[in-house]
Structures are given as C-alpha cells and as structure tokens.
C-alpha cells in the first residue's frame, strides 16, 4: 500500500451558482420502511430504513435510505453511494468487511442509499425495464440530493461527508458539483470522474439513439451465464465453500467462484481471491445481494462526462476544477495503470487543496470494499481522515 499526500493550489470561484433543479423532498415525504433495530445480535450498530417516491411516479420510481449508527452523539455523518447493482441494504454484517458498520461502531453515522434499481424485481418483464431510459445520471443525482437532504434533516448537520464506490464514486463527484456547499469531504472508493487521457468526444444524442434502437435500456448483471446460474453459484458458496463444484475443473465450489471472479475482468481486476486478498465466501455474500438491472444510459453519461473538462448539456461537472472540498481516494492496482492514473487524475484535478491518495497494491476492485486487509488499509484510514475533518 502506498499513501501519498498532495496539495493542489486551486482558487475557488468567487460565486457558485446553484443548479436550477427541483427542490429536494421534504422530511415528511419519506416513509419509514424499518424502525430502528440492531443490525445483528451483539452488534453496537442499529439500522433504520426509509423509502421515498420519485418522479415521474412509475412502479419502480422509489429510492431507499438506511441509517447505521451506534449509541451516543455521532462525531460526523456520511452519505454512502453504492456501486453499480449495489444498494444500501446490509450484505455483510461484520465490520471487518463492511465500511458502514466499521464507521458507525466508532461514532460516524452512515446513511446508505438504495438507488431506484433496488425497487426493480429480478423477474421484471422486459417491457417494464423501458422505464430505465430516463434513469440517467442527472436523475440519480437528483435522487442523491433528496437523500442528502433527509440525512441532513435527521442528523442536524449542514454538511455531510459523501462516499462512493465505483459508479457511486462518479455520482459522488457529480453530486459535489451540484451541492458543494453541503459536502464536508469526499471519500472516493475506487472510482474516477474525468479521464487523464481523454479519447474522442462522445456524441451523447447519437449514443442514446443507438441504445434506443436496441431497446435494451437495462444492463443485466447475470451476463452470458444468466441470473439464476449466477445466484445459484453464490448461494452454493455461502452454504459451503468447500462443497462440490459444478465445474469439474475445480475441487470445490469456493475455488470455482474464486477463479470466476479472478478472471472476470482480466487477471485480478474484479477481485484477487486466488492471490489471497479476498475470501470467496465473503465475496459471495456481497454479490448475492446485487440488484439485477442497472440503467445502461448511465454508461453513456460516464463516457460523455469523462471525455471533456466541461461536458456540454450537463451541469454535473460545471464546477469541476473548482471543488474546494477535501478528497480521500483509495484505488486498486488490479485494473491496470490507466485505471489508477484516471482515478488519481480525477481526485487531483477536482479543485481541492486537501487531497490524499491511497494506492492499494495487489487489490482488485471489490477487494477495496471486502478484502481481508480492507479494515486496516481502507476503513481505519478513512475513519481517521473523516475524524480529523469533522466539525
């Protein structure tokens, strides 16, 4: 692990104009989905959950928010934005593999968001998935504004720390561009915003038209193997990682999953269980809880915004280079040099004078969240960083 501290001298713009967007939902627009209860027997952390309807009011236009906290007065409040197909619901209930519980047990209150995707059932009819055509990054950032307003109302804080993993990191940067005055700091968990070496500009209208021609508005995490086969593999590993594999090439089902994840995005890119960085059983518990579908249009948004310093027709990067907000970045090396450089570039050029980089050597993407050393190499530094900047 390498940790680098860097100051970037940037001048904050004299006036930051508020985004012309709809006002966040009022506190009474949220409904309690689960009253406060312990997350697990013997845990000092409790959970409360809420849901809120979002426009235009379709069957899946609902977001959720989970609060994780221990007893006593929190030292800080953090809003957590999950990665693609992830949610704010607990997949892992041990703090050694869950940043939210680690922070909450130490006095940092965590609000974790459920995107609209969490309301979409795995067996949703294909025609119902067309609702995702309007679930672009701007729509999700508006949902984040609503969740942030609720977190501020519940916590009594004017500013929140905002953390995001993977695509959640992209959305954290985007949200900070929209409401910088409400962000105390960004905890970026293995995700970029702007490319350090941009390729050609992406024509968003043409890309969306091409997507519309396919009619495939939702990406399916089940991939070529299918959703049920994916889920069956995860459940088998959770039940007994030393049980028999469905593929004769492996001695155990745990070894089978380890190899699938080791090679999914290239050697050690998605995760590095064969290198001992993560445990297949822990990874299975994380992955089995994924939401099946995610809006494909957001892949286009990511390409459009990353390719230019100020992408046209979006306000999600309008303050890029002028974000005078502390940034803490953790980035894996398993996804290659371009990934590392793009993540570093995004953090360094956001506009902050207070940027800390942590390069996690030998880690894959998911290992940043649930690796066997994540508690000491990610969670503890994140706790110390937030604590030092809490007001």
Question: Residues of each region from the PLM?
Answer:
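Alpha/beta-hydrolase
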Residues: 203-326, 330-335
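Short, surface-exposed "cap/lid" segments of acyl-processing enzymes
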Residues: 71-118
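Conserved loop-alpha-helix segment in the C-terminal half of the alpha/beta-hydrolase fold
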Residues: 331-360
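Alpha/beta-hydrolase fold nucleophile elbow
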Residues: 155-166
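Catalytic active-site module of serine/aspartate enzymes centered on a nucleophile-bearing elbow/loop
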Residues: 354-391
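N-terminal cap/lid segment of alpha/beta-hydrolase-fold proteins
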Residues: 30-72
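Conserved hydrolase catalytic core segment
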Residues: 167-170, 174-197
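Alpha/beta-hydrolase active-site loop
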Residues: 130-153
């Amino acid at each position: 692990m390498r940790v680098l501290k860097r100051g970037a001298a940037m001048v904050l713009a004299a006036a930051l104009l508020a985004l012309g967007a709809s006002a966040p939902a009022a506190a009474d627009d949220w409904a309690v989905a689960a009253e406060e209860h312990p997350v697990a027997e013997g845990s000092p952390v409790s959970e409360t959950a809420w849901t809120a309807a979002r426009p235009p009011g379709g069957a899946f236009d609902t977001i959720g928010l989970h609060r994780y906290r221990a007893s006593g007065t929190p030292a800080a409040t953090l809003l957590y934005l999950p990665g693609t197909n992830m949610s704010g619901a607990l997949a892992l209930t041990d703090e050694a593999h869950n940043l939210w519980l680690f922070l909450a047990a130490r006095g940092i209150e965590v609000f974790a968001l459920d995107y609209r995707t969490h309301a979409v059932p795995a067996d949703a009819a294909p025609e119902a998935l067309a609702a995702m055509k309007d679930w672009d990054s701007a729509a999700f950032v508006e949902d984040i504004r609503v969740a942030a307003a609720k977190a501020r109302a519940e916590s009594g804080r004017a500013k929140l720390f905002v953390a995001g993993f993977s695509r959640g990191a992209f959305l954290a940067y985007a949200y900070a561009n929209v409401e910088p005055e409400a962000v105390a700091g960004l905890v970026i968990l293995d995700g970029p915003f702007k490319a350090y070496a941009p390729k050609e500009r992406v024509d968003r209208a043409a890309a969306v038209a091409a997507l519309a021609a396919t009619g495939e508005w939702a990406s399916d995490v089940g991939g070529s193997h299918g959703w049920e086969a994916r889920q069956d593999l995860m459940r088998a590993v959770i039940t007994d990682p030393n049980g028999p594999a469905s593929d004769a090439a492996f001695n155990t089902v745990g070894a089978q999953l380890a190899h699938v994840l080791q090679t999914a995005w290239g050697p050690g890119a998605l995760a590095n269980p064969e290198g001992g960085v993560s445990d297949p059983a822990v990874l299975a518990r994380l992955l089995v809880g994924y939401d099946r579908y995610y809006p494909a249009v957001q892949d286009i948004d990511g390409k459009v915004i990353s390719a230019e310093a100020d992408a046209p027709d979006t306000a999600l990067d309008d303050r890029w280079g002028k974000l005078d907000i502390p940034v803490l970045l953790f980035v894996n090396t398993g996804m290659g040099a371009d990934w590392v450089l793009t993540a570093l570039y995004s953090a360094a050029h956001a506009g902050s004078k207070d940027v800390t980089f942590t390069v996690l050597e030998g880690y894959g993407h998911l290992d940043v969240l649930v690796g066997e050393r994540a508690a000491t190499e990610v969670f503890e530094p994140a706790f110390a960083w937030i604590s030092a900047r809490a007001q």
